[in-house]
């Protein structure tokens, strides 16, 4: 049995995933060669780590145990996770801690903005834990963070990766009105897996949320991502692509699910690089402007470069339509 502890102060510890403690340990499959990464050791990685600590910020890179943290932090790229490090949901795939969240940090918007400016970021990704305890799901806080970044770094493009704002009327509208450049909301997996993988969410609510973004602002880029290796069938992935295209989603990411601990959902399969390439080909054929599909693809991986490619793809499409 594996117990994961978080240190919340110099002498206090808490169990990171208390809701998973009763679960039997699951089998951990050996990773194939194509999924392995080196431990981060670079100077740039440590500088980014110190900057994050100095501004008292949380990153999804650390909290979710992202395998790309060494590469991204070496380049001084980071995805900031706002509204704390404790989530009100308990998804079976996720390494973020579950529990009763703390009060919002009112200094966080300014602290994030200062870090963005200090790092000289041309593109930043802001995500959050789920905050079902808040009346607006944290929409106002997202808004304040976006505004603070705009004030501190006017040329920085902003990508947000949001929760689903389930049963939070008006929350989505407020976030879209703050005008992020990219609105990302991950589907995470195919609908048949939701009860076991993402039990607190609703598949078609998430599809509708992405569709609603385009209704509110047709010019805003929309993005979504899924993990594979959770027992899904290929035809289910293709149907999910169709559902996202029906919502006019621009950008799709597909990556390999990696099991954080033995208490999390097990990896049912390691999808080969060839199969990822096949998914990419099909997704482009279905009309996505941008597709990133590989074992180590994550929502925020290469986000800045991908945004430039996404913008260029839209311009190319508009020019072709005008001819």
Swiss-Prot record:
Primary location class: cytoplasm
Compartments (UniProt record): Cytoplasm
An example Gene Ontology CC term for this record: cytoplasm
Biological or metabolic pathway of the protein: Protein modification; protein lipoylation via endogenous pathway; protein N(6)-(lipoyl)lysine from octanoyl-[acyl-carrier-protein]: step 2/2
Binding positions for [4Fe-4S] cluster 2 per the UniProt entry: 87, 91, 94
Keywords, in A-Z order: 4Fe-4S, Cytoplasm, Iron, Iron-sulfur, Metal-binding, S-adenosyl-L-methionine, Transferase
Bound cofactor: record note: Binds 2 [4Fe-4S] clusters per subunit. One cluster is coordinated with 3 cysteines and an exchangeable S-adenosyl-L-methionine.
Entry keyword Zinc-finger: no
Residues bound to [4Fe-4S] cluster 1: 61, 66, 72, 300
Cofactor(s) this protein cannot do without: [4Fe-4S] cluster
Disulfide bonds: none
EC number(s) recorded for this UniProt protein: 2.8.1.8
Region feature (Disordered): 1-27
Domain Radical SAM core, first and last residues per copy: 73-289
Pfam families: LIAS_N (PF16881), Radical_SAM (PF04055)
Top-rank taxon: Bacteria
Reactions the enzyme catalyzes: [[Fe-S] cluster scaffold protein carrying a second [4Fe-4S](2+) cluster] + N(6)-octanoyl-L-lysyl-[protein] + 2 oxidized [2Fe-2S]-[ferredoxin] + 2 S-adenosyl-L-methionine + 4 H(+) = [[Fe-S] cluster scaffold protein] + N(6)-[(R)-dihydrolipoyl]-L-lysyl-[protein] + 4 Fe(3+) + 2 hydrogen sulfide + 2 5'-deoxyadenosine + 2 L-methionine + 2 reduced [2Fe-2S]-[ferredoxin]
GO molecular function, one term: lipoate synthase activity
Coiled-coil stretches noted in the UniProt entry, renumbered to this chain: none
CDD domains on file: Radical_SAM
UniProt record similarity statement: Belongs to the radical SAM superfamily. Lipoyl synthase family.
Protein name (record): Lipoyl synthase
Organism expressing this protein natively: Agrobacterium fabrum (strain C58 / ATCC 33970) (Agrobacterium tumefaciens (strain C58))
Annotated gene: lipA
